A protein has these predicted regions:
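Short beta-strand scaffold segments in enzyme catalytic cores
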Residues: 23-31
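Short secondary-structure junction motifs
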Residues: 18-22, 65-67
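Zn2+-dependent cytidine deaminase-like catalytic core
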Residues: 35-128
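Short, basic/aromatic recognition patches
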Residues: 1-18
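Secretory/periplasmic and organellar redox-cofactor proteins
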Residues: 9, 124-143
Length: 143
């Protein structure tokens, strides 16, 4: 497992420690982490502060995103996939998509390379959270 997905997992665990949903993200440029984020919907009472959005906000204005790669512990949803496409991010690496299939086809149809690592650690993190917080998870995915 590479350092970048490990950093995203660390962000997910930080979110869980804060009482939130354990999804983390990092943005990579020139083989360096330039931003980190995690889902803060619960912490900030903000329905759009998903991990990927938090990460992009933390990156600030970097100009061109075409040379970046976004890592997320879970396949990005349509909200986050829209941001990926809007900013021209060319590659997304997801820890898993079993828990939530996300918007892979949408991103790929817009020229984004999508890699699903199918990591047990990411699946377990989500599975344990959902078992303990089904209502919160259903709220997060719009059910």
């Amino acid at each position: 497992m590479d350092d970048f997905i490990q950093a995203a997992i660390a962000e997910a665990k930080l979110g869980l420690q804060e009482g939130g949903i354990p999804i983390g993200s990092v943005l990579i440029k020139d083989d360096k982490i330039i931003a980190r984020g995690h889902n803060k919907r619960v912490q900030n009472s903000d329905p759009v502060t998903h991990a990927e959005i938090d990460c992009l906000r933390n990156a600030g204005r970097i100009g061109n995103y075409r040379q970046t790669t976004l890592y997320s512990t879970l396949m990005p949803c349509y909200l986050c996939a829209g941001a990926v496409v809007q900013f021209g991010i060319k590659k997304v690496i997801a820890g898993e998509s079993e828990t939530f299939p996300g918007a892979r086809e949408f991103m790929e149809s817009h020229g984004v390379e999508v890699v699903d690592l199918n990591l047990d650690e990411c699946k377990q993190l989500m599975s344990e959270f959902i078992d303990q917080n089904p209502q919160l998870w259903n709220e997060d995915i719009g059910n």
